[in-house]
Amino acid sequence: MAAWANGVRAVLLDVSGVLYDSGGAGGGSAIQGSVDAVNRIRHAGLKLRFCTNESQATRSHFAQKLKRFGFSISEEEVTAPGPAATRLMKERGLRPHLLVHNDLLPEFESVEKSDPNCVLIGDAAENFSYKNVNRAFQVLINLQKPVLISLGKGRYYKETDGLKLDVGAYMKALEYACDIKAEVVGKPSPNFFLSALEEMGAKPEEALMIGDDIVHDIGGAKSCGLRAVLVRTGKYRPSDEKHPEVTADGYVNNLAHAVDILLASQDCNQ
């Protein structure tokens, strides 16, 4: 029996690359067995949270997309960086210049954006043109104390037609050009995982993270005291299992495989 499966009371699921692969005409497709795996987690009475750095849509649109793929999910079960970034900016009186996907813009309607004193960057996809990235650079370089807020720092993610550059690549370009360090809202920030646990009413030692990113999903969760399992779907690469800095508590073929092991452990402990 896998040691990582013992005593789990709460499950945090990464989404893209674990539940579904994004892209294509329909916006993506569910990974085989993942819809049923989510239902089995619920049926077992485990606490469940969907933890994503998704920054191409609001939580509401994101939940609706997953429902179209067949998943049982509500907006309230999604932990995403957009709402956290909104709270942060309001608390600190920050007025962002936005470099984000058009579908995420409604997330920031309540934030003052005139005379920007920071830049907020997300996965802007086609909006990552030279003109737009350079404009973000110009805003930052002209600030006395430049502030760059990034919705995650992933290097790449998988869509149905291949791997795509993520927000982290563009974040690093702005960091380098302006000689600054971005503030990351989202995985692997400890606050992201701790916020998800608080929303679930769960403790780190009783929670399991399942993801496809060895650094941001697995490393981020383990730094907060969670157990973490890497799936061999999504952006997974065989070299991840020999990562020099991060070792997962387990490696599984996909989400369905992880749930098989997890629920077998639950049965043995009853």
From Swiss-Prot:
SUPFAM superfamilies: HAD-like. GO terms for molecular function: inorganic diphosphate phosphatase activity; metal ion binding; phosphatase activity. It holds the Pfam family Hydrolase_like. GO terms for biological process: phosphate-containing compound metabolic process. Coiled coil: none annotated. Gene3D superfamilies: HAD superfamily/HAD-like (3.40.50.1000). Binds 1 Mg(2+) ion per subunit. This is Phospholysine phosphohistidine inorganic pyrophosphate phosphatase. It comes from Xenopus laevis. The gene is lhpp.
